[in-house]
Structures are given as structure tokens and as C-alpha cells.
């Protein structure tokens, strides 16, 4: 039994601080009145709406309270209505229960994070706080939660919550360790569902936290302006389109972050959607990326390997990358379909993305010419072994002959120093020629091939050698081949070539220019449109017929030229044969323009007896004395596939032509 004392609409003061109270009930034990003890059994206080800051000041006036002081300084505004129940036991111990509402509150934590429009109901009992129907705004994003539980033990406060909200890039960038604004439109808003647990001390300093969040997005553009993929993905346009996407994010105080990303993507909205999966994990400074995707809609080109995949052909990517501070490593890369396979392992990069080291590269694939390559390159310390069953070297040879940029792949390395051992069972040179058992080794020092010795056979008789060494401080490359045709074909302006042996020497003058000499012996030219047209325009139809028939034979061909990145400057080409001799010069711009000029003389002897040469006399001079063509000057110019030829008759030969011819005649004797 108890006695109730009630008072309504009062102001409760402690010193100068007050609270507006709607109702106060004091329950006194009935028996205690007669015993003159007047023991309180329960106190019920129902407040009116008060300012939260005033309540905190009121509490601090009653008792020094550090959390209350911190909250007082953090709360900018807000209202509270509360019902306070205090149960007093026989031993005078107390049990407190508080229920109430927080309205339109603004909270500034550490003067950095501002939470606005905070509204919720709360219930506190036995050091457990339950918050329901929470609504608030942070960075103009609405957050809601049906239930939040807080447990207060000693000097620690642990909060568990489920939150539904929209999330923008500002907020996502705070919890994710990369600036996502570089990749997404700033106006984009994601849907998020999160569970979190966070522990504070009595000064509201975070002691521990664990966040699990699921983020949903649809119809989103991923901007990749800073990532240069165009070189490898030909239909890449600096962005991809994402749809039906989901991210699962886990973050905790132990410096661990996990993100699982799964979405469909398109390079073009007309494409069929393909799957993209990314697993990201971060612990302290170590980050790990696992990427899986379907590249069916991508046009893929790997120029160094002469590989191309068109759209709507399967190709899948599995990639694992780790990052430690600013240092990246490709732990494994697998690019594959039913017919093609590319594998890389343990590629370590420096901060400038230059390769420091690698352990393995394997490729089994069909190239653009539908030739199947099977290559294995492994590295152990400073030794690299290149072993291949089949390897198409045609493109590599062409670059070696025609450009100074011969070691461009070495620019991928930070500073490679290694010995490379070669063992290639079959090396394709062109559609007609293969090298068997290409073996040897090369030495790379400071990213430069300073020495190489390679040898192979076309067949039991014809051989090939490649040598590279330093002579007088300059790198000199020498190629000899008993069969010249596959190498001569690499020069687009030389067509219709048959027979001959080749001797090629190139000296690197500096990083941008090399000087080369190409000599070919005992060969024929036939079905060569430019030469046939030249002979026809020069009224040398008889020799022109040879050019389209059995061919025009030459005893020797000399070419002296200089290579730069996209230009071959021809200082001199001299070809000597029993029917005609040619002297010319000019230049060839890579894939753009051929420009040649020179002289053609229809005989091997330069004297006044041209008319007496059997068979050719009537062709060259005609039936009447003084008729016929002594020689012509010519110009050949235009794109490689559309050359224009002009000729003019000459009556005398230049001293240079005569000198070069006499040199050859003397050597032949």
C-alpha cells in the first residue's frame, strides 16, 4: 500500500537551471508514514517539451557529468520530452527507467560531422537504451532505423543498429578508402541497408566499430577517364554502363575493409549486359583486388602478341592485384576462352608502374593470321627462359628491320638485367617460311639488349643467324639468312621477290636513329607493279614483259638507310643486273607515304656500244641510230597501296651512277 502525492505544471530548479515538468507523482509507503520513516517507493516525472541543452545543464548542476558536458557542447539545438520512473528499493537502491522523444535535433561531433533533423523515440532500462523510429539527415541524405540498441557498461557505450538510407558519393567516400567522385557522377544516389555496431568511451571517443552495408544501384555510368584502356580495348570510350549492381561493404576498427561488388556492365548501351565482379579487401596498408569479368562485348587487341578478339566472341578475365602503400603487384592474371589462354604471375611494379620483377608468362593462342602460338616465359632471379613449341616472329622481325624502337617492350621494366635463353621449336617468319630449332641467348643490361647470339635452320641446307654485340661503344646487329625472301618482304616497297641470300647490318647511332646496310645477292623480281609500270613508262616493254614473266635477275642489291621511329630514310639503293641497273634514294613514312626517285639504265655496261648488245639492242636503241632510250630518271610517290610513277628520259649518266657501276664491275672481276 502507498500514498501518492501529485503536482502538475511545475518548474523544477537546481540552482539556476530548471526543467518544465508536466506532472510529478511521489509514491510513499503507507506503513512508513506511521513509522515516521516517510520512505519513497517510486518517483514519476512526466516532462513538458524542454530544450535538450537545458536538460544537460540541469544534470551537470546536480552532478558533474563528463558525457553530459560533451553532449551539451555537441548539440546545437533540439527538443526532448521524457518520462522518468525511479523505483526505490527497501535498501534504498534505485532502478531507473526513462522513455521519451527527441525532436528536431542537430548534433555536431568533433566539429566535423553534422547530423540534422534527428527524431526518435527512446526507452532506457537497466543500462540498456532502445531507440526506435529514428530519422535523421547527414550530408543531405535521409537515414532511418526501426531499432537501435545501446548498452552502457562502466565507461563504455555499445550501440547496435539497422539503418536504411540513401547514400551519395560524399558519404561513400568517407567510408571507402578511394575518391569515388573520380569514377561516378557526383549527383548519383545509392540505396543502402546497413548493420553496425560501435563502442564509445565516456568521452564519446570511438573504441571499436563494425559496419556491414549493402548498397544497391541501377543505370549508373562508371567514368574511367584516367585509365588508358583504349590501347587494349578498342571499343572502350572512357566509361562503362552499370546496371543491377550491388556492393556489400564491411568495415571495422581493426583497419579491415571488405567490399564485394557485382554488376552487369556494357561498353555501349546497345550491347548485351555482361557480368563484372570485384572483391576488395584492405588490412592496414595492404589492399587486394580480385576481378572477374566477361569480355565478350569488348574488342581486344594485344599488339605485341599480334592478338585480336572481335566483339561477340568469348573471352574471360580473372585478375588478382595487391597494393602495399603505392606499390602494386599482379599476383595472377588469366585471360582465356576455349581456344586462347594468357597467364601472368607475380608481376611486381614500382611506384611509376614499371615492372620490377615477374615469375611467369604463358600464352597459348591463335593470332591475327590464325597461327597457333605456344609460349612459356619463366624467370628465376636473373635468368629468363623462353620456351616455345610455336611462335610467330614475323611482326618482331619487321619491327627489328624497320624501326629504331626495337626494344619497346623493355620500356615496361624498371631496370631489367638478365640473361634470356631461347628454345623455339618452330618460329614462323611469314606464310611460306618457318625457322626450326631457333636457339641461343641474349644479354640485357639496364633495359637494353647488348648481346645476342641466335641460330636456326630453314631446312637441312639453309640457315639463319642473328648476332648483336657492342663494337666501338655502339650496338651492332647482324642478320644473315640463306633465304632472303621472308625478310625482304617486310619492306613494303619491295615486291615480287624470289631467291637470294640476305646480309643485314644495323648500327645504333643513338636512341632515336640507326644506320643500316641491306645486301641481297642473286635474286629475281617479278610481278612487281611499281617496277613494271616504270619500265612500261620508259618504253622498255621487252624488259617489262620479263618483270611480269620469269622475272628480272639482279646480281646484287645494296640498300643504305636510316631508321627513326616512323621513318625510313633511304640514302641509296643500288641494284645491278644483266638487264637493268637502278640507283635511287628517298624515304618511307610508316603506313603513310612512299617517296623514291632515281635513275634506271637498261644495261650492265655503261658505254657507247649499248646498241650492239644482242637481243636488248633492238629493245633499247631501236632500228635506227640515235633512237631508243639510253636511260630514264623516275619518281615513285604515294601511299603504299596507290603509288604514282613518273619518268623522264636522260641522255647522260651521273658520275655517281657510273662510279657505283664501275665499283661493282671491278669486284665481279
Predicted regions and their residues:
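Membrane-proximal interfacial segments on either side of biological membranes
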Residues: 1-10, 22-568, 573, 577-669
Amino acid at each position: 500500500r502507498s500514498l501518492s502525492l501529485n503536482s502538475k505544471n511545475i518548474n523544477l530548479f537546481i540552482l539556476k537551471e530548471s526543467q518544465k515538468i508536466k506532472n510529478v507523482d511521489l509514491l510513499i509507503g503507507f506503513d512508513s508514514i506511521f513509522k515516521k520513516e516517510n520512505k519513497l517507493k517510486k518517483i514519476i516525472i512526466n516532462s513538458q517539451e524542454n530544450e535538450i541543452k537545458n536538460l544537460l545543464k540541469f544534470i551537470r548542476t546536480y552532478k558533474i557529468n563528463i558525457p553530459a558536458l560533451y553532449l551539451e557542447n555537441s548539440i546545437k539545438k533540439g527538443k526532448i520530452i521524457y518520462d522518468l520512473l525511479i523505483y526505490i528499493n527497501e535498501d534504498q537502491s534505485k532502478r531507473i527507467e526513462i522513455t521519451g522523444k527527441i525532436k528536431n535535433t542537430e548534433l555536431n561531433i568533433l566539429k566535423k560531422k553534422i547530423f540534422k533533423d534527428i527524431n526518435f523515440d527512446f526507452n532506457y532500462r537497466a543500462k540498456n537504451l532502445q531507440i526506435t523510429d529514428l530519422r535523421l539527415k547527414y550530408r543531405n541524405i535521409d537515414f532511418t532505423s526501426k531499432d537501435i540498441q545501446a548498452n552502457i557498461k562502466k565507461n563504455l557505450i555499445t550501440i547496435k543498429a539497422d539503418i536504411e538510407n540513401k547514400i551519395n558519393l560524399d558519404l561513400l567516400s568517407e567510408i571507402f578508402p578511394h575518391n569515388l567522385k573520380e569514377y561516378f557522377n557526383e549527383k548519383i544516389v545509392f540505396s543502402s541497408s546497413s548493420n553496425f555496431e560501435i563502442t564509445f568511451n565516456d568521452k564519446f571517443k570511438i573504441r571499436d566499430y563494425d559496419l556491414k552495408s549493402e548498397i544497391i544501384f541501377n543505370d549508373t555510368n562508371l567514368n574511367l577517364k584516367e585509365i588508358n584502356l583504349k590501347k587494349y580495348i578498342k571499343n572502350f570510350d572512357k566509361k562503362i554502363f552499370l546496371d543491377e549492381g550491388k556492393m556489400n561493404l564491411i568495415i571495422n576498427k581493426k583497419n579491415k575493409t571488405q567490399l564485394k561488388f557485382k554488376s552487369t556492365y556494357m561498353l555501349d548501351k546497345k550491347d548485351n549486359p555482361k557480368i563484372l565482379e570485384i572483391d576488395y579487401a584492405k588490412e592496414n596498408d595492404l589492399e587486394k583486388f580480385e576481378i572477374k569479368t566477361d569480355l565478350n562485348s569488348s574488342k581486344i587487341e594485344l599488339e605485341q602478341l599480334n592478338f585480336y578478339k572481335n566483339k561477340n566472341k568469348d573471352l574471360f578475365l580473372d585478375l588478382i592485384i595487391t597494393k602495399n602503400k603505392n606499390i602494386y603487384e599482379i599476383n595472377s592474371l588469366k585471360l582465356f576462352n576455349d581456344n586462347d589462354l594468357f597467364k601472368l604471375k607475380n608481376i611486381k611494379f614500382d611506384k611509376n608502374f614499371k615492372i620490377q620483377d615477374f615469375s611467369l608468362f604463358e600464352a597459348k593462342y591463335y593470332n591475327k593470321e590464325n597461327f597457333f602460338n605456344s609460349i612459356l616465359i619463366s624467370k628465376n632471379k636473373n635468368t629468363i627462359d623462353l620456351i616455345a613449341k610455336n611462335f610467330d616472329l614475323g611482326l618482331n622481325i619487321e619491327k627489328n628491320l624497320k624501326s629504331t624502337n626495337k626494344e619497346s617492350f623493355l620500356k615496361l621494366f624498371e631496370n631489367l638485367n638478365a640473361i634470356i635463353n631461347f628454345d623455339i621449336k618452330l618460329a614462323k617468319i611469314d606464310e611460306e617460311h618457318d625457322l626450326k630449332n631457333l636457339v641461343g641467348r641474349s644479354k640485357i643490361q639496364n633495359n637494353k639488349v647488348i648481346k645476342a647470339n641466335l641460330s636456326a635452320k630453314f631446312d637441312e641446307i639453309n640457315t639463319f643467324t642473328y648476332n648483336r654485340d657492342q663494337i666501338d661503344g655502339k650496338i651492332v646487329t647482324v642478320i644473315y639468312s640463306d633465304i632472303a625472301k621472308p625478310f625482304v618482304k617486310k619492306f613494303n616497297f619491295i615486291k615480287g621477290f624470289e631467291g637470294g641470300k640476305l646480309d643485314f647490318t644495323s648500327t645504333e647511332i643513338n636512341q632515336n636513329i640507326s644506320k643500316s646496310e641491306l645486301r641481297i645477292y642473286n635474286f629475281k623480281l617479278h610481278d612487281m607493279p611499281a617496277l613494271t609500270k616504270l619500265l612500261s613508262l620508259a618504253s622498255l616493254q621487252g624488259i617489262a614483259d620479263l618483270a611480269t614473266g620469269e622475272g628480272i635477275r639482279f646480281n646484287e642489291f645494296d640498300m643504305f638507310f636510316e631508321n627513326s621511329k616512323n621513318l625510313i630514310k633511304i640514302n641509296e639503293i643500288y641494284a645491278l643486273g644483266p638487264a637493268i641497273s637502278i640507283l635511287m634514294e628517298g624515304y618511307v613514312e610508316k603506313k603513310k607515304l612512299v617517296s623514291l626517285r632515281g635513275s634506271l639504265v637498261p644495261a650492265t655496261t655503261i658505254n657507247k656500244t649499248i646498241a650492239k648488245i644482242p637481243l636488248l639492242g633492238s629493245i633499247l636503241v631501236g632500228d635506227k641510230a640515235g633512237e631508243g632510250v639510253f636511260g630514264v630518271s623516275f619518281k615513285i610517290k604515294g601511299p603504299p597501296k596507290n603509288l604514282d610513277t613518273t619518268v623522264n628520259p636522260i641522255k647522260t649518266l651521273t658520275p655517281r651512277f657510273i662510279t657505283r657501276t664501275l665499283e661493282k664491275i671491278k669486284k665481279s672481276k
